[in-house]
Amino acid sequence: MKNKVVVIVGVPGVGSTTVTNKAIEELKKEGIEYKIVNFGTVMFEIAKEEGLVEHRDQLRKLPPEEQKRIQKLAGKKIAEMAKEFNIVVDTHSTIKTPKGYLPGLPAWVLEELNPDIIVLVEAENDEILMRRLKDETRQRDFESTEDIGEHIFMNRCAAMTYAVLTGATVKIIKNRDFLLDKAVQELIEVLK
């Protein structure tokens, strides 16, 4: 039986990692196992090993050709893992760079991963802004609520494009303030 590959995406600060971790925890209790792989972490490990970055948030500042090369290497590494486990790939649908939006899952990565489902985790623009302002653990560029809305729109466009190329389904889950459990439950149903 083919292992499931589920890609979970969201703009920075939306809480996609939190929703994913809680859903996977609950599924484990039911005997359903997934390995969570953060695409950015795999990219960071490769870039750090090569001496290109010191901290993760520097990745998006690398020249686009470097980012693309590292993406390809990360895609190959994750595809190897998917041969052994059900995989949840925690990543970004698009990455906002100084030169424009970079697809988080370009064709060369999609070919490797061949996802079954793409899940977009979203929230209201102002909720995301407030979460970012409270998070002192990351070095993020400031974005207005309008910028965040544009990024969410670009993520949706990219996710549907990825689906057209792979045949994956696309599910949108809202992670609203004080409704984390609802978002977690929705993701559990998608992953079952």
UniProtKB/Swiss-Prot annotation:
InterPro entries: Adenylate_kinase_AdkA (IPR023477), P-loop_NTPase (IPR027417)
Summary of temperature dependence: Active from 70 to 90 degrees Celsius.
Pfam family, one: AAA_17
Protein's cellular compartments: Cytoplasm
GO molecular function term, any single one: adenylate kinase activity
Presence of keyword Nucleotide-binding: yes
Enzyme Commission code: 2.7.4.3
Gene Ontology cellular-component annotations: cytoplasm
Chaperone found in the keyword field: no
Keywords: ATP-binding, Cytoplasm, Kinase, Nucleotide-binding, Transferase
Predominant place of localization: cytoplasm
Residue numbers binding ATP: G10, V11, P12, G13, V14, G15, S16, T17, T18
Reaction catalyzed: AMP + ATP = 2 ADP
Gene3D superfamilies: P-loop containing nucleotide triphosphate hydrolases
Subunit structure: Monomer.
HAMAP family assigned: Adenylate_kinase_AdkA
Family under the similarity heading: Belongs to the archaeal adenylate kinase family.
Protein name: Adenylate kinase
Organism: Methanocaldococcus jannaschii (strain ATCC 43067 / DSM 2661 / JAL-1 / JCM 10045 / NBRC 100440)
Gene behind this protein: adkA
